[in-house]
Design a protein with these regions (language model features):
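Extended, charged alpha-helical "arm/stalk" segments used for dimerization and assembly
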Residues: 101-202
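Extreme N-terminal "head/tail" segments of very large remodeling/mechanoenzyme assemblies
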Residues: 1-141
């Protein structure tokens, strides 16, 4: 069985650097705006292997107004003091999995190379191993794609950085021993749900 153990978020909306520990059963709770959908949307990118904004905020049961750019540049509203707009930076969403059959761990993730001119490039990657202690941060800054490739090559001999999302999805599913992309469509549907607004009706 493959189990999700950790989620690393760097420069993802208002998360500058956060490691989320994951157990067998998890309860994600908090008031509106606490960041529940922000975490789920990040997780979707890695698990679905795509960056389509149509998937964002489905768990909140509201018409999604969120965009990939808004998440990356922390620019969901005006006058946000944490906005990264106009800056060069890197964003990381990385998941560490445990394989209790192979008795090892592996990592699936994506980094976004974001530029001050508004351009961005996504780079999905997979390697056998755990999240590094430095969390892909050197000298206080998240690694750019050049430094990431160098770091992975030096520390994880079988690491792969993929040129296309399709190539990443194919290898990610293979790592899970899944050979049909239909499971990804099922995962999309599973995220959207209707919240409980009347506890008596629920009972």
């Amino acid at each position: 069985m493959k189990k999700l153990k950790k989620i690393l978020l760097i420069n993802w909306l208002y998360f500058s650097k956060e490691i989320i520990e994951v157990g067998d059963v998890n309860f994600l709770t908090g008031k509106n705006g606490a960041g529940k959908s922000t975490v789920i949307d990040a997780l979707q990118i890695v698990l679905l292997g795509e960056t389509n904004a149509r998937n964002f905020n489905l768990a909140a049961n509201e018409r999604s107004q969120r965009t990939l750019d808004g998440y990356l540049r922390a620019d969901m509203d005006e006058n946000n003091p944490y906005s990264r707009r106009g800056k060069d930076f890197s964003t990381y969403i990385v998941c560490e999995f445990e394989d209790d059959v192979e008795h090892n761990s592996f990592v699936c993730g994506v980094m976004f190379d974001c530029r001050s001119d508004g351009s961005k490039h996504d780079h999905f990657f997979i390697y056998v191993g755990k999240l590094p202690e430095n969390c892909f941060v050197e000298d206080g800054e998240a690694m750019d794609i050049h430094d990431l490739r160098k770091f992975l090559k030096q520390n994880f001999s079988r690491a792969e950085v993929y040129d296309t999302q399709w190539e990443y999805r194919r290898n990610m599913l293979s790592r899970w021993n899944v050979h049909n992309e239909q499971v990804l469509r099922m995962m999309k549907k599973a995220v959207s749900f209707r919240p409980i607004v009347d506890i008596q009706q629920f009972i």
